[in-house]
């Protein structure tokens, strides 16, 4: 939950909290003020990058042509390794989102200013993976949003039974009485 993580950036137009920092997974909660830039188009070579929109709208740029998609509350966006992606808050309101890096690739230390060798690179000359490799689960999608080797994310009711797993599991309570369950 916001306010319970390690704060690594706190300004009037941006706040970032690390909620989970493990080798398998880093989860951050972020707030951007209106018209705030995030990351310009880039790739990761060794890990996946995911966004779950909690409030406002996230403008997501994806694929070799950096096609723009506006993601409303409740949307999950997934960028596998080698897929060009970037993001910003292009709107007039506040943006809040969860960001997942699986495996972590040292993302938390990068946010702390201690990992200059973080797995983030300029888009490759060949454009990287086609944008069809991105996964965007629209708002209102329930159940399993993504299930890949490196990460599994499910939305379920707070009272629904959880399946035991040997994987690292993080839970995030959503405002609508549902739970986001993340396994890495």
What does each model-found stretch correspond to?
Residues 60, 97, 153-155, 181:
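Short hydrophobic/aromatic-rich beta-strand segments that constitute the beta-sheet cores
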Residues 83-86:
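Short, charged beta-turn/beta-strand-edge "cap" motif at the junction between a beta-strand
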Residues 51:
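Structured binding elements
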Residues 65-81, 160-171, 176, 180, ...:
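Short acidic-glycine-tyrosine-enriched beta hairpin
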Residues 31, 88-141, 172-184:
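Double-stranded beta-helix
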